[in-house]
Amino acid sequence: MPYRLIKKEGAARRGEFQTVHGTVQTPAFQNVATAAAIKGGLSAHDLKEIRAQVMLCNTYHLHLRPGDKLVAEMGGLHKFTKWDGPILTDSGGFQVFSLAKLRHITEEGVTFNSHLDGHRIFMGPEQSMQIQANLGSTIAMAFDECVENPATYEYAKNSCARTARWLLRCKDEMNLSLIHISEPTRP
């Protein structure tokens, strides 16, 4: 997904990048569809009418409900939402931060207690990429840890280093996932 710079003025810049689901002009507002539905009842048609470019869906929440495997069986998020434009899925990393009282972080990944029913869930870089591949994401984000504020310098430094290591694992897993997706159905 090469980025093309169109114009720059001071620190501001305008550009675009191509995806298999269309061109994205930047900067871009991403319409949030946490559970694959835009709040306020906007449809895919409505999004086109307001010239929306990207739908942002939440990996963690979709993994829990309705389930990434069910979404895959239904043809992926594009068919599930009837949206043919680019879909960005977050990694689940924000939940590492937002569910702080319900999680345990290790080098392997994060163990959560579901906010829905308390059952234990493990998500690491590989699982995050597998879930995003199941969802049929156009733009998949690498699994990361959002550090709390305030945090000690040492904690932030260690978290940043762990996130960089997780990025390499995400890249390896995504490359493996793409091998198993045939070109015509590739997200």
Task: Please describe what each predicted stretch is.
Residues 1-177:
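Non-catalytic, usually N-terminal nucleic-acid engagement modules in DNA/RNA processing proteins
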Residues 177-187:
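Residue-level detector of conserved catalytic or cofactor/ligand-binding positions
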